Amino acid sequence: MGMTVKELQKWLNAHGASPKLKEDGIGGTLTKSAFIQVFVNKDAKAITKDQLLEIAKSLGDNSIKRIEAVGKVESSGSGWFDSGLPKILWERHYFYRLTKRILESATFGLISSPSSGNYTSDINKNGINDSWEKLAESVCVDPDKALQSISIGKFQVMGIYYKELGYNQPIDMLWAARNSEYEHYKMLA
């Protein structure tokens, strides 16, 4: 059994939600706002040369040049949006496959569909990438399945692979990406 909305609210409170959420299992506006707020990190640590070398060696390379090139090309140089949120892409077709439900949003149209698409940047011009708003809306329906339906970080690794990457739950993978660039590279390697 995956994380419930009530467990998500408890997790958000433990990770700095402000104001504290009522842990009632009802995912409303405050839960959506808190979800986005706790993942903002404008001071995320950049990867060091030693960490890059560690990643390169784990991939069988003794030079950081190739892994640096991959990082530059794959992410336009950064794993974060200007807002301080880690880069993600909402994949509505994954959410549909996992939930078997078509969901509509007044702002974003379909957030769950058998087909991919509906990729938007900032349709409501509020400075928050739409993938984050779609995710915030979807975690209020099914947190685990929503978090498995995003590609995360500098290298856009799908959340559905959280177990293979050594995370206990999908939210741990996103939290790791929030904290440092090194974690983005570890997901790739």
Where are these regions (language model features)?
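Short acidic, glycine/serine/threonine-rich helix-capping segments at coil-helix boundaries
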Residues: M1-I47, K57-D61
